[in-house]
A protein has these predicted regions:
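Conserved small/polar residues in nucleotide/adenosyl-binding loops
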Residues: 496-502
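Viral structural modules
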Residues: 1-495
Length: 504
């Protein structure tokens, strides 16, 4: 007996591995750089050069890039920066990995510390967590009927979520920023940070709209008589449309964005003066778009003239419970410790959202974590004005998801929308944070899916042993379908004036 099926795509995680790598290395200050007198600020980033795949293993090669802003140990006490590369090579065991699989890789620098050994040597310690996984699309055929029109069919209406689009893409954000007229030309770029903030991702017809802003900071030495220290903050709003064939506005996007590379370069203007900062950021997008379809799923068949047995296999089918794009606001006051003077001005602050735990609670998802905040500020010391502090702001937020249960699965995206730091007085700073906490929740249902129908001749002896007339007292939960199938008869809906033969 041939089944009529509906083909649907489901995305499954084939294999996954999590490795932690520790770094503990000494680094010598390059000969072209002066001695270190005092460290101001540090930052680290991971650069992956290659992923080599073999049977069951993936070998990562790359480097941990560490940058340091410091004050020289000379009479001038000028500010300099240096950059060091710590090579990494790590084998990750991924059971079931095969040649040709595409390994997705994520990482998180959980801890980074730089200690001054002496003026020409520093010690770098770091803990980095790598998560590698492979996802593959599985074709699932769901039965919606049989070709034999004489067979009685039992169906159930249901909503099924399928993966309509799964792809990766790259977008670039480029912008030239002119210095204001009251700023001197750039002599040397010392330090910079580039962040993504305020992401808004929407599905449209055959495209994905990505909206956000690049928030950048630059500290430089001016090309004036004193090589004065100058800085600027600038926001670069962007909106780009990424081609995505098969996408539509009613699909549910689950798009993860990472910025593996950003570059800030000094450029010349039309007069040949170095008064332009060019930012070039590379954004990687992993796009998954889900589509919900309404089906009448075939759950059983029978006929009084043959014995039909449905062979089933259990699957977890998903349907949309809720999508909730919520915002979490956090305000806190932090004391400035170990400063050598009173704060005169805050130059720049940046932050990173780190989710420590998620938990399904009544009608929601409890999200807890921290925002790591770095603040660069100036004190009233003309010889050594720049100082930096790092702090962690905890947060706890419940994303509303009515009727969520432990059987549900969810995808969470957390990113920074706004971060502001304001001086309360000369030794206290107020931090205001707005985060986006976006969740898409799917309800999972264990369903026995019919794979095929096996037909056999009726057991004549069993039929002959059955009474010719049966009086049956209906029990709670009975349906005409179950009764008719049990006694090898048909559903006489027209005689019972029932509109739904599956209910009594």
């Amino acid at each position: 007996m041939e089944l009529i099926t509906k083909k649907m795509q489901m995305l499954e995680r084939k294999c996954e591995a999590v490795n932690q790598i520790t770094f503990d290395e000494d680094f010598n200050v390059p000969d072209v750089k002066p001695d270190i007198g005092r460290m101001i600020q540090k930052k680290g980033e991971i650069q992956i050069e290659d992923i080599q795949i073999s049977q069951g293993k993936a070998f990562l090669s790359g480097a941990l890039m560490v940058s340091l802003l410091y004050v020289s140990d000379s009479e001038e006490r000028k500010i300099y920066s240096l950059r060091g590369n710590l090579p990494l090579g790590e084998t990750m065991n991924l059971e079931g990995l095969e040649n040709g699989d595409k390994v997705q890789l994520k990482w998180d620098i959980e801890d980074l510390s730089v200690q001054l050994i002496h003026s020409r040597k520093i010690n770098i310690k770091a803990l980095v967590t790598f998560t590698a996984y492979v996802e593959e699309v599985r074709q699932l055929e769901l039965p919606i009927g049989v070709e034999d029109g004489e067979i009685s069919q039992k169906k159930q209406d249901c909503s099924v979520m399928c993966t309509a689009v799964h792809k990766k893409d790259i977008m670039r954000v480029k912008e030239d920023i002119d210095l204001s007229s009251n700023k001197p030309d750039i002599y040397e770029l010392l330090w910079n940070t580039v962040e993504i903030r305020g992401l808004d991702i929407r599905a449209e017809t055959d495209k994905i709209g990505v909206k956000g802003e690049l928030f950048l900071f630059a500290l430089y030495r001016g090309n004036d008589d004193t090589n004065s220290l100058q800085w600027l903050e600038h926001s670069v709003p962007f909106y780009q449309e990424m081609e995505c064939q098969g996408c539509s506005a009613d699909m549910i996007p689950n798009v993860e964005i990472a910025m593996p590379q950003s570059d800030l370069k000094v450029k010349q203007d039309d007069d040949g003066e170095e008064r332009i900062l060019g930012v070039d950021a590379v954004l990687e997008l992993e796009m998954k778009l889900y589509e919900e379809e309404e089906l009448s799923l075939l759950t059983d068949v029978y006929t009084p003239v043959r014995d039909c047995r449905a062979v089933r296999e259990n699957y977890k089918l998903e349907s949309l419970l809720v999508k909730n794009f919520s915002k979490c606001k956090v305000n806190d006051r932090v004391k400035v410790e170990n400063s050598q003077g009173k704060i005169l001005q805050i130059c720049h602050s940046d932050g990173t959202v780190k989710v420590d735990s998620t938990q399904i609670v009544e009608n929601g998802i409890l999200v807890e974590g921290i925002v790591q905040v770095r603040i660069l500020y100036i004190i009233g010391d003309d010889e050594m004005p720049f100082y930096s502090m790092e702090t962690m702001i905890p947060f706890s937020h419940v994303i509303e998801a009515e009727s969520i249960t432990e059987n549900c699965v969810y995808h969470l995206r957390a990113d920074l929308e706004q971060l502001s730091t304001t001086m309360i007085d000369s030794d206290e700073i107020e931090v205001k944070i707005v985060m986006n906490l976006n969740a898409v929740v799917f309800r999972q249902t264990d369903t026995d899916i019919i794979q095929r129908i096996e037909e056999q001749e009726l057991d004549r002896e069993k039929l002959r042993s059955m009474p010719g007339i049966v009086g049956y007292q209906v029990q709670p939960g009975d349906s005409l379908w179950d009764i008719a199938k049990k006694f090898y008869t048909t559903i006489a809906v027209s005689y019972t004036h029932l509109t739904l033969p599956t209910k009594l």
